Amino acid sequence: MSNENLSPNSSNPDLTKLNNGESGTIDTSKFSPNEMKLYKMYGKLPSKKDIFKHTMQKRKYFDSGDYALQKAGIQNNDPINYGKNNLPLTNPSKLREDIIKRRISTCPSTASTAGVVDNATLIQKEGSISSGPPSSNNGTIGGGSTSSTPVGNHSSSSSSLYTESPIR
């Protein structure tokens, strides 16, 4: 070979002289600019145009978890549709329906039959923070009467500040 500059950045290398012992010559006049650049850099063109798509088609497993599950003989029975490259395609409406069904099935008021609520559920609802203050009926939670004893080590003279008056 001659002392030509054959780097990928060189402006005018003669690629027809670079047949590397092949019997045929390469017609570079039909190459696109991108193909010409690749040929200058690597001396040949890649066999597949879309390399990423080609590698994804060869791939059997999405990740190591899928590989381990198949080796263990466990089949995934999820109703998820898979595309050509085995990536899950989500169905937003189906996902919303599943979430709503799950929430309804775990709700304690719908778990009881025909609107009959048992006492444990009623007490749990009354004692919860989100239900608000307890009702003012006779069945108060926590003993019934309020205590007006002073808190801490105070003298008995300070107990006159704490009178038994209902808060209304």
UniProtKB/Swiss-Prot annotation:
- Record organism: Saccharomyces cerevisiae (strain ATCC 204508 / S288c) (Baker's yeast)
The yes or no answer to whether the keyword Cell inner membrane is present is no
Per the record, the coiled-coil ranges are: none
UniProt subunit comment? Interacts with RIM15, DHH1, PBP1, PBP4 and LSM12.
* Similarity remark: Belongs to the endosulfine family.
Q: Which gene encodes it?
A: IGO1
Q: Which InterPro entries match?
A: Endosulphine
Q: Does the keyword Phosphoprotein apply?
A: yes
Q: What is this protein called?
A: mRNA stability protein IGO1
One Pfam family it belongs to: Endosulfine
Where does the signal sequence lie? none
